[in-house]
């Protein structure tokens, strides 16, 4: 019997209910592609993330309703900045570091691409409407 690769996905945090959650489409897509999705709670501790990543075959950085903290890329928060969830930022950065150390593939979607960009030293436009001319 062939073993499905285990793909870790960081959860979203719902402040109103205090629950971790994950949109069903992420886990369904990973399963349909032959993988086994594993939800990763936002415990932003290096030892925890490293112990989880030891069991993974890949990482999927999912979308989120929040923005990456601009202080991570050397900018001050703009008035158009959305909510920042520091636990998600730090969890993503730790996941990227641990995945890179183990040579694991990473699929980044929406907010996940922003996290990957910042992890690699990039910056972001916080509010396109007011910061981009034309």
Describe every region a protein language model picked out.
Residues 1-107, 118-125, 129-134:
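N-terminal beta1-alpha1 cap of cysteine-dependent amidohydrolase-like domains
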Residues 110:
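Conserved G/P- and acidic residue-centered "switch" motifs that form tight phosphate/ATP-binding loops
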Residues 113:
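The feature captures the ABC ATPase H-loop/switch
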């Amino acid at each position: 019997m062939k073993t499905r690769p285990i793909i870790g996905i960081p959860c979203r945090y719902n402040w109103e209910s205090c629950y971790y959650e994950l949109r069903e489409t992420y886990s369904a897509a990973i399963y349909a592609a032959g993988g086994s999705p594993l939800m990763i709670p936002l415990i932003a501790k290096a030892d925890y993330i490293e112990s989880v990543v030891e069991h993974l075959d890949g990482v999927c950085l999912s979308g989120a309703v929040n923005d990456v903290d601009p202080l991570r890329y050397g900018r001050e928060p703009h008035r158009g900045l959305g909510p920042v969830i520091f636990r998600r930022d730090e969890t993503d950065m730790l996941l990227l570091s641990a995945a890179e150390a183990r040579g694991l593939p990473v699929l980044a979607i929406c907010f996940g691409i922003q996290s990957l960009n910042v992890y690699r030293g990039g910056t972001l436009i916080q509010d396109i409407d007011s910061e981009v001319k034309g």
